[in-house]
Amino acid sequence: YRYENGRDLWGDALSRTNISTSVAALTDIDADPVIDRGRVFAIGQGGRMASYELVSGQRLWEINVAGISTPAVVGDWVFVVTDDSRLLCVARTTGKIRWISQLKRWRDEEDKKGAVRWTGPVAAGGRLILVSTEGDLVYINPADGALAASRDMGHRMTLSPVVADNMLYILADDGRLTAYR
């Protein structure tokens, strides 16, 4: 907003208007917007991810995906987890999807029971790092979306990992904080 008069500079909705489902009606946005080199990247649970010009608010591109986890911008790519447990690599300038990697979606894949939710990604050590509500810690190759490594942490995790001072911090839902170098 303009500090001189309190008026909004610009705004937009991240819910899809061309579909009539209960998901499209959701306006909840849990993911923080990411600002990088004059652009804003945002995703909402209502079914839209978009890129905007920071100052004018002009929508530069949009894709029809829903999510609640903050995207990660690395170089020319935006990485984001969707609400159906897909990790997407999206071109920063065009919104074109480079690759999609399907993460574990169900605790019981055969019966499709026990939905798994993912948070992240964060970028560190040349990898994308994500955690899940099933206690999974995964490392993904950002070039192709391939699983590089995984580990069962044994604890439910709903908060995104944090990277600071060459350390990876993971806070489990039971309060257990784990740090890796």
Regions found by a protein language model. Name each.
Residues 8-35, 58-74, 100-122, 150-163:
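Extracytoplasmic beta-rich repeat domains
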Residues 7, 50, 88, 138-139, ...:
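WD40 beta-propeller blade core
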Residues 37, 44-45, 82-83, 132-133, ...:
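Structural signature of WD-repeat beta-propellers
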Residues 88-106:
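Histidine/lysine/aspartate-rich catalytic loop segments that bind and position anionic ligands
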Residues 2-5, 53-56, 92-94, 141-145:
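Short loop/turn segments that connect beta-strands within beta-propeller blades
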Residues 153-181:
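Blade-level signature of beta-propeller repeat domains, shared across WD40, Kelch, NHL, RCC1
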Residues 59-60, 70-91:
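Acidic (E/D-rich), amphipathic helical modules within compact regulatory domains
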